[in-house]
């Protein structure tokens, strides 16, 4: 199959898949995004999620309260609207980044909620949804968002149809266990 995303999509369609996730969609060229969109349409597949922003794996961003980090994130969200329209996506993944070990968790949570409220205001008019993805601490140590109850609390506080949870069973079985 190789590295060509068009070949990969065709293979997925051939074996029965009906949707496609591409975390790196934002970094693909506009022409490739359009080719992907056309291929998905032709093959009767839907575009699943793509990552809507730069994820900081090594330093706090959304949890930090840093205005420049917030503005960068919101700009990424704005730019992702065009990507979503281009590839017929409704859902985009958001990972709030690293914990700030020098800051109380309640303040970090407030910072994340405030930023996501602003992002929701940007997404709602376009009927787009960011999905918060809790990632397990074993594979991604030090991240802010690790558990589904935490994601639920944040989404309830954001209170927007544009803020939901991506419940990745792989991560949640490792992190929370006993899911059955």
Q: What kind of feature is each model-predicted range?
A:
Residues 63-164, 174:
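Active-site acidic/histidine proton-transfer and metal-coordination neighborhood
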Residues 18-23, 58-66:
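Glycine-/proline-rich flexible loop or hinge segments
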Residues 6, 34, 109:
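Short amphipathic alpha-helical segment that frequently serves as the phosphate-/nucleotide-binding helix
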Residues 9-14, 29-51, 79-88, 120-125, ...:
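Acidic (Asp/Glu)-rich catalytic clusters
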Residues 2-3, 22-35, 100-102, 138-142, ...:
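Acidic-and-aromatic substrate-binding clefts and catalytic sites of carbohydrate-active enzymes
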Residues 1, 49-64, 96-100:
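N-terminal small/glycine-rich loop or linker at the start of catalytic domains
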Residues 1, 20-22, 47-52, 92-94, ...:
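Hydrophobic faces of well-ordered beta-strands that scaffold small-molecule active sites
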């Amino acid at each position: 199959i190789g590295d060509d995303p068009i070949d990969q999509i065709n293979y997925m369609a051939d074996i029965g898949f009906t949707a496609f996730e591409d975390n790196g969609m934002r970094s693909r060229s506009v022409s490739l995004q359009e080719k992907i969109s056309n291929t998905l349409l032709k093959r009767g597949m839907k575009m699943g999620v793509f990552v809507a922003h730069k994820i900081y794996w090594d330093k706090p961003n959304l949890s930090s309260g840093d205005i420049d980090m917030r503005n960068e994130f919101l700009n990424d969200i704005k730019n992702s609207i065009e990507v979503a329209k281009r590839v017929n996506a409704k859902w985009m993944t958001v990972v709030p980044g690293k914990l700030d070990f020098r800051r109380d968790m309640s303040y970090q949570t407030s910072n994340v909620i405030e930023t996501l409220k602003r992002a929701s205001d940007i997404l709602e008019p376009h009927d787009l949804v960011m999905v918060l993805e809790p990632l397990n601490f074993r594979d991604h140590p030090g991240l802010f968002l690790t558990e589904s109850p935490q994601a639920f609390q944040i989404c309830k506080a954001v209170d927007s149809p544009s803020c939901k949870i991506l419940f990745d069973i792989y991560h949640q079985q490792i992190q929370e266990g006993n899911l059955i």
